[in-house]
Amino acid sequence: MRRAKIVCTMGPAVESPEKVRALIDAGMNMARLNLSHGGYDEHQERLDLVRKIALEHGHPVAILVDLQGPKIRLGRFADGPHDLAKDDIFTITTDEIEGTKDRVGTTYKGLPGDCKPGDLILIDDGKVTVQVVEVSQTDVRTRVTEPGTVSNNKGINLPGIAVSVPALSEKDRADLRWGLKAGADFIALSFVRSADDIKDVHQIMDEEGIRIPVIAKIEKPQAVQNIESIVAAFDGIMVARGDLGVELPIEDVPLVQKRCVELAREAAKPVIVATQMLESMISNSRPTRAEATDCANAVLDGADALMLSGETSVGEFPVEAVAMMARIIEKTEGDGLQRIRPLLHNPRTKGGAITKAAAEVGEILGAKYLVAFTQSGDSARRMARLRSAIPILAFTPEVGTYHRMALTWGVESMLAPMVNHTDEMVKQVDSLLVESGRAAIGEFVVIVAGAPPGIPGSTNAMRVHRVGDAIAGVAPAYR
């Protein structure tokens, strides 16, 4: 069983039912809808198609709606792309103009107020770099230090500059409301800078009467500085290495990735490693050796999931990319689960203590499975963060939790009806394991649950169960 999960970005390359079915067969666990591109109708079609085919498979696939965020961009040019040479003077203005080689507008009207002489501005993911030489009320005059081509709507990064853009743009607010109504399982918030950025998201969720987990995308230096409070405030994180590698010195990214994974694991929150995982497979049927090693290292860091972007959304080999990533993960885990660093901190909650004890008992007894009964998914996440070699089954009566646990490392989620007693829970486990052939009569499983059932966050019990005892009615409670 593969433990680390795979996130696939949906797009034109995987529009057909056959392609979506092939993605799920190859190993997709979560589908990402990137709201930087496309309209609501096409995203709704993709969401509905994934849901339909996942239901046919009996296989949960989570849906992530990824908000564009307040991306700062150049405006449009009147006569196409322009090549900028070293030491050219290039002005970025808040005026509404059709751009020329010397002067172009920007989507961010606060740019002159945030910049000062000496600051660097990176254009198109750092392909072009300019240095601020003069600032006026409307214009930022710069000198080109890294030459290259500029064209319509290219992104701007301001490394080391504390920009004053809001956490949510007007587009993001509308997109968030759409995602909640459409049935998303997770929301991803782009360009997070502090823990406070979640407040506006929660306000809109409360207005809509829908609360779902929010993933913070770590792609700004301020987010790295505030990473501990961000992990505490959000429901998970994504190490978005594209913008992160532009805003930070690129040599800092590997250790930032490891630190993010470590903190998320300690907090029992999912962490996704993203960007350029198998980038060359956009146009090639096989990845580079470096990409394969990158995927393996993310697995060994302990990431919950690895994400494919252009590889699946617009690539020539989307299904092959998923299958390749699945093979890399499986091979790495097959020989290297023990290489994932164990958590050194002691749990500070009742649920954390019980799940840790369950994993330790399971290892001593050679248990076939660790089993969590959970309404919110919290017990399953706390068990998963231990990265035990024992497979985890998570039973839940909540459809949303059933889908969301598809993102959690090592967890196979099961939809089960609510019962009124823990003995009924054990019967559910027995029936599933025996009827599916997952475990043999007489093998052991370790179960964690809340007693009485039905109270979220009430995990307070651990039971060692011998498979077959419940369906055989060996005790009066099972009859």
For the regions a protein language model found, what residue spans apply to each?
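Non-catalytic helical/linker scaffolds that mediate oligomerization, partner binding
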Residues: 1-479
